């Protein structure tokens, strides 16, 4: 039977896979996120029976219309990327949603939480448990699935482990590597989530979600290393706390630092799971850890075969399995009174004889460095000096996405350990416009991360200068510039 389903937090990892599954099963889906552009870049904009809705639960907006015709809700919101105060942010979002949920005609809420340990003091785990309690206070039927590590491409916990294995031949780790948990394959989790719709009930329930094996993090990383032909040594150190380990995370993994830090702080506890109750309720064949990892590695190129990269064949052919799934980024945003049209007119002049608006000497130096290792960055080229089209080559760059007066994305063409792109984004905010210049980088192993951090000071210096110079060329005013790095 077709249902109207609201997916709250569709821009997250599980939501990005759950929404297509629900559509394939014939349901009408409302997918919400704080960044609709991210949802659109997945190619969701024109899908039948899918409605994309901007939703920021922290702004205390009225949710009556959102919940009006909804039968089932999937609540997938978490605040790990919010920063040090994410627990307060997460619980406040849950309270706000629960307030309107209580007054709605929603039949059932399926909430994806986290496995719990009796002695756990992790803020991440506490927040997940308390969110479930808040949702139950609405009086609605709440089905809470408590999951541990999800094995799939883009799963933050899985990607942290994969980056550790790919980047470090020897790992000096906190003693949490001996903690045990029950990792589950993404495919198994999605089956549980979607089959729950077929089990109508008026009784709230809590289920542990567990794969077929109880493994330590050390065992998982060693087995992952074997599957990618990477021999590693894991050496636990009692004096190395998770808090201390969290400080160097940004230099080892491309997973966003706030998320990785929150996860690491929860890894020090055993998270035993008894999945027998859920298996009896919704039987399925559970995939082994090794098979789940192999499946995740086969799906790894899904990040590149997307609208974010313009479905570009050159980007797809250059992607390698050991590239970081999550990109590093660095950019500079500037407010201005210049029009979108004037800014776009200048952005289209990038490259060729015109150069790059600012610090052209540094651009030339980088091009010479590329030439010295066999690259072709010294070959200056533009099809047209004034206008750009999709697929155009600009020196060593390639136009992979273009939206007039708003957006330009260039595929990085020089030799370096990773894959990247350079984006120009113009947004109209009514009283002012913003111009943002940003580099995105998927590092190849530890060398790729070293390259990124070595180049970051130059990136920030150049992007700041480029944005100001673009505004100056428009004979306009600029104010409130802002640096952003992840």
Language-model regions, residue ranges each:
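Glycine-rich portal/gate segments that line the openings of hydrophobic small-molecule binding cavities
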Residues: 335-344, 348-417, 469
